Curated annotation (Swiss-Prot):
GO process annotations (BP): nucleotide metabolic process
Origin species: Thermus thermophilus (strain ATCC BAA-163 / DSM 7039 / HB27)
Protein name as it appears in the record: dTTP/UTP pyrophosphatase
Residues with site note (Important for substrate specificity): R16, T69, Q151
GO CC aspect terms: cytoplasm
Key words, A-Z: Cytoplasm, Hydrolase, Nucleotide metabolism
Pfam families: Maf
UniProt xrefs under Gene3D superfamilies: 3.90.950.10
InterPro entries: ITPase-like_fam, Maf-like
Family: Belongs to the Maf family. YhdE subfamily.
Length: 187
């Protein structure tokens, strides 16, 4: 990217989203918006989009990308667990079952706003209490929607993913890259 271009402002505190965008070669400036993520009475997919929009609108800049990921178990949102016990409960509920992961993004360019929601279906394998205790003990799931990270130790919990794996991680990278590229914002 030419030196005269502004950076891509990531309206997210997610180290995973930042790392994904940096892996593509984009210079990133993180601006964590002060947006409350709890309490919106919306269905899971609509909630992901509303939160991404709120985050994006809360940050100034020419090129702004915000995203939010929501884990949807039979229409119920499983957010970030409050503590290890709630993480344990989430994993027990997900064990041996499929669920949906909705990742929404809000991309503001100098000329337009693009908003999309991408969904993947995740299948957990049946988990023993010992496996759940091992994963909860790692602490990895405490800052992640649904209480697990598919790209880290949580990969051991998954049977398979239908759809884009990066949607589960927190950003449909290929789609975001294509949108930025088509608008002349290149690494």
């Amino acid at each position: 990217m030419g030196s005269g271009k502004p950076p891509l402002i990531l309206a997210s505190g997610s180290p995973r989203r930042k790392a994904l965008l940096e892996a593509l070669g984009y210079p990133i400036r993180v601006a964590v918006p002060g947006v409350e993520e709890e309490g919106l009475p919306l269905p899971p997919k609509a909630l992901a989009q509303a939160l991404a929009r709120r985050k994006g609108e809360a940050v100034q800049g020419e090129w702004v990308l915000a995203a939010d990921t929501v884990v949807d178990l039979d229409g119920e949102v499983l957010g970030k667990p409050k503590d290890p016990e709630e993480n344990r409960l989430f994993l027990r509920r997900l064990s041996g079952r499929p669920h949906l992961v909705h990742t929404a993004f809000y991309l503001r360019t100098p000329k337009e706003v693009v908003e999309e929601v991408h969904t993947a279906k995740v299948f957990f394998r049946p988990l023993s209490e010992e496996e759940i205790a091992w994963y909860v003990g790692s602490g990895e799931g405490l800052d992640k929607a649904g209480g697990y990270g598919a790209q880290g130790l949580g990969m051991a919990l998954l049977e398979r993913v239908e759809g884009d794996f990066y949607t589960v991680v927190g950003l449909p990278v290929s789609r975001v890259f294509a949108l930025l590229w088509a608008r002349g914002f290149r690494p």
